[in-house]
C-alpha cells in the first residue's frame, strides 16, 4: 500500500519470498492450481497466435488446448468473473486457469516467442524505416560510385602523383575541419536548450514512494564476467524503492561465464537476467531491443557496464 505496487511484486523484489513460494501463495489465495510453466506441456504454435507483449501486459498466457476443447491459461493476476469472461472470449473456449508469478510468465514468453523476439530485435527497424537502418551498408549505386572514384584516383596517381597527393591531403583536411565545425555548432546550439532543475534535500524528503515512477534499468553484458563483481554491488546501492526498480541484465545465451558471474554475485531479488536468444548481429543494441520487450518501467535507463 505504501508504494502502490502489486503486493506479490513487493514480496519478491524485497527478497521476502522466492518465485516458487510466491506461486504457491498466489494459487492458494486465488483458489487456483499451481502451474509450473517450466515443466507443463505447451503448444507453441497455438500460443503464437497472439502477441507476446500484449499477453504480458494483460498478465496471462494460453498454454495449450485440451482434448475437450478447453484452454489451459497461466495467469499472474486474480481471476475475476469479468476477467474470466474476457479471456474466454479471446481464446474462444472455456478456460482452466493456473497460477504463476509475473516472472514465470515473462520467462515463458521468452521461451515461446524466442524466434519472434530475436527477429524483431534485429530487423524491426530495417522493415519499418529502411533509410534509418544500417542493415544495407551500401546501395548498388554507391558501390558503383566508389569503384568509379577509385579508378579515377588510381589514374590520377599514375599520371600526376605529387599533385594528386596534395589534392588528397587538402580534401581530407577540409573534411576533418568541416566535421569539427559541425560538431561545435551542434554543441553550442544544443546547449541553449539545456535545462538544469535543482532539487533540495527537503523536496526529496517530501516525496512519497507511492508517487515515484517505476524504473527499468537495462544492463547489456557480453563477455563482461570480469566487471560483474563490482557492477552488481554498485547497482544495488541505488537509493530507490526496490519494488519500483527492476534491473535487467541482458546476457547472450551462450555467454555462460557472465551468467555464472552474476549468480555468484548474489544480486538483489529485483535484479533479473534476460537470456538473449541467438541471432545476428550479436551487438548490445540488439540485446537492448530484446530488453525493451520485457521492460515494465514507466521510465527506462541504459547502463553500459564498460563505463
Question: Model-derived features: where do they sit?
Answer:
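Short flexible coil/turn linkers enriched for glycine and charged/polar residues
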Residues: 2-5, 54-57, 65-69, 89-92, ...
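N-terminal membrane-anchoring/stem segments of glycan-assembly enzymes
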Residues: 119-207
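N-terminal, charged amphipathic alpha-helical interaction modules
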Residues: 1-13
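Extended, hydrophilic extramembrane loops/domains of integral membrane proteins
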Residues: 87-125
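Internal catalytic domains of large membrane-associated glycosyltransferases
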Residues: 199-307
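Polyanionic, low-complexity intrinsically disordered segments
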Residues: 13-90
Amino acid at each position: 500500500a505504501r508504494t502502490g505496487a502489486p503486493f506479490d511484486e513487493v514480496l519478491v523484489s524485497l527478497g521476502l519470498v522466492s518465485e516458487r513460494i510466491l506461486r504457491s501463495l498466489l494459487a492458494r489465495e486465488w483458489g487456483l492450481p499451481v502451474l509450473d510453466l517450466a515443466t507443463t506441456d505447451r503448444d507453441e504454435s497455438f500460443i503464437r497466435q497472439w502477441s507476446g507483449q500484449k499477453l504480458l501486459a494483460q498478465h496471462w498466457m494460453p498454454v495449450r488446448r485440451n482434448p475437450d476443447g478447453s484452454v489451459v491459461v497461466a495467469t499472474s493476476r486474480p481471476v475475476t468473473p469479468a476477467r474470466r469472461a474476457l479471456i474466454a472470449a479471446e481464446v474462444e473456449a472455456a478456460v482452466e486457469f493456473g497460477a504463476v508469478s509475473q516472472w514465470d510468465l515473462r520467462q515463458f514468453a521468452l521461451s515461446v516467442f524466442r524466434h519472434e523476439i530475436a527477429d524483431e530485435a534485429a530487423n524491426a527497424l530495417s522493415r519499418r524505416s529502411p533509410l534509418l537502418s544500417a542493415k544495407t551498408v551500401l546501395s548498388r549505386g554507391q558501390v558503383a560510385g566508389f569503384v568509379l572514384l577509385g579508378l579515377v584516383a588510381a589514374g590520377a596517381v599514375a599520371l600526376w602523383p605529387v599533385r594528386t597527393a596534395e589534392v588528397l591531403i587538402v580534401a581530407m583536411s577540409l573534411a576533418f575541419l568541416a566535421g569539427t565545425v559541425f560538431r561545435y555548432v551542434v554543441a553550442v546550439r544544443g546547449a541553449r536548450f539545456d535545462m538544469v532543475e535543482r532539487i533540495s534535500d527537503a523536496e526529496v524528503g517530501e516525496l512519497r514512494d507511492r508517487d515515484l515512477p517505476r524504473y527499468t534499468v537495462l544492463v547489456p553484458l557480453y563477455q563482461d564476467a570480469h566487471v560483474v563483481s563490482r557492477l552488481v554491488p554498485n547497482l544495488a546501492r541505488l537509493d530507490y524503492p526496490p519494488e519500483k526498480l527492476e534491473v535487467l541484465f541482458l546476457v547472450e545465451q551462450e555467454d555462460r561465464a557472465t551468467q555464472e558471474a552474476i549468480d555468484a554475485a548474489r544480486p538483489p531479488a529485483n535484479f533479473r537476467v534476460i537470456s538473449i536468444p541467438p541471432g545476428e548481429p550479436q551487438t548490445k543494441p540488439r540485446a537492448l531491443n530484446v530488453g525493451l520487450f520485457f521492460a515494465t518501467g514507466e521510465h527506462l535507463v541504459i547502463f553500459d557496464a564498460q563505463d
